[in-house]
Amino acid sequence: MEFGLSWVFLVALLRGVQCQVQLVESGGGVVQPGRSLRLSCAASGFTFSSYGMHWVRQAPGKGLEWVAVIWYDGSNKYYADSVKGRFTISRDNSKNTLYLQMNSLRAEDTAVYYCAR
């Protein structure tokens, strides 16, 4: 019985570690078309510099749309056609932070933006 309880406790600890990963977005707002915004995503609970990072978005009443990805070291970046030339993804591994600079904003860019690992 004692052995079984130990395993349950170990599983609970491991699940707790997984739940400590946090990605907190900030910087959103309401702006007029043609203006700019910069989003930030503060990461914690994992080795940020070891992971490629993505931005995705969800427009009202629609599904998730991938926006951009940046490699773990910032060496490569890729964008959805809908934002290419207007949005720039970047990262600061010393600050564990991901960014999305959004220029020339359009009405169709209205969405909830999420960062993802």
From Swiss-Prot:
Gene3D superfamilies with a match to the protein in the record: Immunoglobulins
Region feature Complementarity-determining-1, mapped onto this chain: 45-52
Framework-3: annotated span: 78-115
Region (Framework-1): 20-44
CDD domains: IgV_H (cd04981)
Record bears the keyword S-adenosyl-L-methionine: no
Stored Pfam families: V-set
Annotated signal sequence range: 1-19
Protein name: Immunoglobulin heavy variable 3-33
Originating species: Homo sapiens
Encoding gene (name): IGHV3-33
